[in-house]
Every structure is written in structure tokens, then in C-alpha cells.
Regions:
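Conserved, single-site charged/polar hotspot
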Residues: 1-289
Length: 289
């Protein structure tokens, strides 16, 4: 998993995940404007509006970063139903002050100190429903008492959070490399798979530990992949095709609790690219040590 970026576009499913509903793709900032205009009121104090929008951005980026839906076989990034995600209304009204605020902060998001994934910033209205995250109406009271947006967020998510500001914007590219990985392959993707399988193995000890976490798809890697595939009812061929790739990603995100408010999280060292380019036989030895 790479360092997070803010996608230029997002695909929204207009219904529950399994519902036969339309998918629409739109610019990320336009999506957040729609969500914010559907979830909160433009008459709220500015700091409450900012706090709520930051929570909405962070929640959305967490869904995209973990490929929560795509790793489960869906062809969208998020749904439009509050049972699973945010409120979103196709062609919904956008309030001007909310639109302006989103344009100012759409590439800012919340992180837990020491972690790099966007916080799974749950929220609820605080009146009809309650949750462990931000209370929308409660944020209004806190803003009226003089709190800043960050102070409001810390009051709900804990003091050990901070904001990433001016995050890079890029394309929303699926993580699957496009071709299956198998014994004899080299590269960053192989390295990531080995790291992830070793972490998954702490929760599923039947998966043998891979002793050398470098960029080579070797025999121990193949055996670990086969065991993983058996556990999760995939064809145990030792090849990391699309279904195995995304199942590994799904289970890794689960054991790391990346889509929970208080999870293990992902450190920057776990997300940095170790091998900046694809490796092929004959690559200089320094790059594969």
C-alpha cells in the first residue's frame, strides 16, 4: 500500500452494495460537496462545517485507500446509503458556502499520529443515532463554545490525531498490477505481498512465515500463497492473480484494522516504496538486497 493520494475522481454506487443500482463517476471535490450538503446545514458555524467536512473526506479516502469495496469484487469506491457510508443525492443541491469550504480543504484529511492511512472517521447525527465518532449536532455546540475544527475533531477522535494538508492529487488507479505474480517474479508488488502475508500469518498461523522479505517471488512465498488460498477458498495454485491479490489486501486491511477508529494502522515505513521501479532478472544487486 502506497502513501495516500487524493483521487481526481470517485465512483459512487447509488444504493446498498448488492443493490442493482447505477454507478456514477464524478470529481472527488464535487462528491464531497454533495455529501456535505446532504449531511449538514450551511447555517452551522464555520468551524463545525470544516470539522464535519474533514471527517467526510477522511472516511471517504479510507474507503478508497483500503479499496474496501473493490477488494470485495465491486466496481465502485463507495455507496450512497448511510447504512454503509455517507448520504449522497444524485443532482443534489450544493450550498455555496459548503462548496467554497470544500474547495479550500478537499485534499486535507485526518490521520492517527504515527499512521498514514486516512482515519476511518465515523460520524452520526448525535440525536437520532449515536456512535463512537463525531456527533454532527454536538460539533455545532462545540463550535459555538469557541472550539476550532481540529479541537472539535480531537474531542471525538482523541488527542492523538493530526491533519495532513495539501495532500497530492492523482488518478484513482486500482492496486492490482495487471498481470499475475508467480514464482520467479521480482518487484515492489512481490515485496508488498510478502510483507502482507507475514502480517496476516500472525492472525492465521497456518500460513508459513516468509523468511526473506525482499522483492523475489521464491519458493517460501509460493507456499505461503498456496496456504492463504486454501484458507480463503481460492484455487491453491501459488499464483497471485486478481482474486488472490484483492483477498490478500482485504484480509490485510482487516487484521491491521485499517477501517476502524482504533486499529493497528499503517506506518509510513510500511507504505513507502522500497523498490521504485519494476525489477527484472539482471537488476543490480544493490536494488534487491
Amino acid at each position: 500500500m502506497d502513501i495516500p493520494t487524493v483521487p481526481r475522481q470517485i465512483t459512487v454506487h447509488l444504493g446498498a452494495p448488492n443493490a442493482n443500482a447505477e454507478n456514477i463517476t464524478l470529481p472527488f471535490n464535487e462528491y464531497i460537496k454533495n455529501v456535505a450538503s446532504s449531511e449538514i446545514y450551511p447555517t452551522w458555524p464555520k468551524e463545525a462545517i470544516i470539522a464535519n467536512i474533514l471527517a467526510q473526506i477522511s472516511f471517504t479516502l479510507n474507503r478508497i485507500y483500503t479499496e474496501y469495496y473493490r477488494s470485495r469484487g465491486y466496481d465502485f469506491d463507495i455507496t450512497s446509503t448511510t447504512q454503509y457510508d455517507h448520504a449522497f443525492k444524485k443532482n443534489g443541491e450544493i450550498f455555496s458556502n459548503i462548496s467554497q469550504t470544500v474547495d479550500e480543504i478537499f485534499n486535507n484529511y485526518i490521520v492517527r499520529d504515527g499512521n498514514i492511512e486516512p482515519l476511518f472517521a465515523q460520524f452520526c447525527d448525535g440525536v437520532r443515532t449515536r456512535c463512537n465518532g463525531l456527533s454532527q449536532w454536538g460539533s455545532v455546540e462545540l463550535a459555538n463554545s469557541g472550539m476550532t475544527a481540529l479541537e472539535i475533531l480531537k474531542s471525538y477522535y482523541g488527542d492523538n490525531i493530526s491533519l495532513v494538508t495539501d495532500a497530492p492529487v492523482g488518478e484513482n488507479i486500482p492496486s492490482y498490477p495487471g498481470t499475475p505474480l508467480s514464482r520467479g517474479d521480482f518487484g515492489e508488488e512481490v515485496y508488498r505481498i510478502k510483507i502482507q502475508l507475514n502480517r496476516i500469518g500472525k492472525n492465521y498461523p497456518a500460513i508459513p512465515e516468509i523468511p526473506y522479505t525482499n522483492a523475489a517471488f521464491d519458493a517460501p512465498t509460493e507456499e505461503a500463497v498456496k496456504t492463504f488460498q486454501r484458507i480463503f477458498n481460492l484455487t491453491p495454485d501459488g499464483i497471485v492473480g486478481k482474486s488472490t491479490w484483492y483477498k490478500i489486501k482485504e484480509i490485510y486491511a482487516g487484521v491491521k484494522q485499517l477501517s476502524e477508529l482504533t486499529g493497528e494502522g499503517l506506518t509510513i515505513s510500511e507504505a513507502q516504496r522500497v523498490y521504485p521501479r519494476a525489477l527484472v532478472p539482471g537488476t543490480a544487486a544493490e536494488a534487491v538486497r
